[in-house]
């Protein structure tokens, strides 16, 4: 006799039979192994993200440098003491050192030569000529390594997929953008800024020559992108400003001049001249004169006294 509250034995057997029949109809639960899970197709959105990341991977250092520039200038626009600016300079030097490790040894040498050459141009342009002036009336410590970052930005551009695929057409597109900016600086922008940017337009032929005639055109074309961002943020945030009329030449200028990248091209071309001089000196003096070499030379010429 079944206990009260429990279904009849036949009913229980019927329930069990029905549940077993259900399992038999549905079959065993499917277990996905690692290979089956890997073979499952991902969503179209996942494929899109993966493809975009793969395409952007060769440009990560360029994106990093383009991101660091406005953050650096924003921080400099907020500081009030020189030691804070020195800290930004030290940070930028460290960043330049780490970023330059991605370049071959010869290019790293060019980057550091650019730092020295650009420092000389900065002292002349800002402190002597005075065509532009920094907020604290000095040459900030982050400016020399900043030139090195711009130069490195251009050097690494030659190995990017877009340059390798499209070649000089990339330079022609950038040159067209520079020409458009120069034209606007003479026509439309004066109505908004009150400045006629003749100085920027005069830099356009210099920039065009380097882009169209130089075998290192990717360097100079990429410099326009880096310096364009640098100058726009630097003048907008008040880190420096260009005088409305340049001293000595009395040429009107925008703030910033449109194709000032032409001036940067002159700086970077000077780096190549210095490099040739360095290699010429190496040919004349093939031996490296380190401290150990000098001491060995001195001690080898000293004979003991009798």
Residue ranges and their predicted role:
Residues 10, 31-32, 36-306:
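Aromatic-rich, lipid-facing transmembrane alpha helices and their immediate juxtamembrane interface loops
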Residues 12-15, 25:
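Charged/polar low-complexity intrinsically disordered segments
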